[in-house]
UniProtKB/Swiss-Prot annotation:
GO terms for cellular component: HslUV protease complex. Belongs to the ClpX chaperone family. The lineage of its organism: Bacteria, Pseudomonadati, Pseudomonadota, Gammaproteobacteria, Pseudomonadales. SMART domains: AAA, ClpB_D2-small, zf-C4_ClpX. This is ATP-dependent Clp protease ATP-binding subunit ClpX. It comes from Pseudomonas aeruginosa (strain ATCC 15692 / DSM 22644 / CIP 104116 / JCM 14847 / LMG 12228 / 1C / PRS 101 / PAO1). InterPro entries: AAA+_ATPase, ATP-dep_Clp_protease_ClpX, ATPase_AAA_core, Clp_ATPase_C, Clp_protease_ATP-bd_su_ClpX, ClpX_bact, P-loop_NTPase, Znf_CppX_C4. Signal peptide: none annotated. HAMAP family: ClpX.
Amino acid sequence: MTDTRNGEDNGKLLYCSFCGKSQHEVRKLIAGPSVFICDECVDLCNDIIREEVQEAQAESSGHKLPAPKEIRTILDQYVIGQERAKKVLAVAVYNHYKRLNQRDKKDDIELGKSNILMIGPTGSGKTLLAETLARLLNVPFTIADATTLTEAGYVGEDVENIIQKLLQKCDYDVEKAQMGIVYIDEIDKISRKSDNPSITRDVSGEGVQQALLKLIEGTVASVPPQGGRKHPQQEFLQVDTRNILFICGGAFAGLERVIQNRSARGGIGFNAEVRSQEMGKKVGEAFKEVEPEDLVKFGLIPEFVGRLPVIATLDELDEAALMQILTEPKNALTKQYAKLFEMEGVDLEFRPDALKAVARKALERKTGARGLRSILEGILLDTMYEIPSQQDVSKVVIDESVIDGSSQPLMIYENSEKPAKAAPEA
């Protein structure tokens, strides 16, 4: 092949055989036998080939299902603590996808689907666990908020919208969507308001639970195509939810009291075991004793509880766990902020007493790991505002006094022997 740049071939103007642009409209034109291709079309072809190769590799790697121990090892890299929950999730997810791999083989025994219920305080890692599972298995994943769902025909989101979101994640590939994972958050917020079935419509509570029943158990959902309901003449997509893994999660505030009340009723008479109301001091410890009847007492209907046979309970995060979360995971917050500062050519150092103070503040706010980012964002705001405009800062040090608000981050300059405090923006 010859490389034709700005000259003309025998006095004729040359054109790209693919896009039709002339040699004057592109940077480079490559000549072949009776054809020409420009540099822009070469780049486009490279992108197409790269995407197809990546998809083929992803599909081939998807056939190898990691063992439960391997799944837990990967979860350990992103989620601190919650050892029991990680083991429960690893086994449940492994069995689910093992069941899917066997579904084409003829067998008298049909394996049922085991959806998962995660119970744990706010910021304990429920969403992160579900996200990490989907990422390591390379399957479509979507998050739905149960508080926005209503029964069909009422203002709000229909439960079928969950499947539409899943389809959007995989470019409306129905086959891929049917192997996906759906995480429904705030599931405790759709509990019915009393133990007795309501005679009035509860469109965002018990009504939503009823609507979710078939979807979670397995049904063929009719989902509008990409155009949505604006084009009613288009055929609806039929999505079978039998093989979609549903993970429901919630904080279930107050469930620990239901569990403790049941435990306190241990028995009567001289031989009855005496139990103290103070037994479950920690919410996470109480959650470990949860029974289906407790969830029904809390406000979930029995049929809905029955569709979630695997229960994973998460512990409250203590100060030590929060400090680990700040530094140990692959995507730990301190590593993320250090990377941001590194892009400016500045080192960022967190002293151990600073990490402890951040963990204490998150505990006081009762936000768990979710509150760590907002705390760090607040203390680093002024520094991140100033540093891009300063060329000679080499290091920023954060200690306990910065977290407490009594001083500003310490900024160390390359050409100055005397370190300076970052000045807050007036």
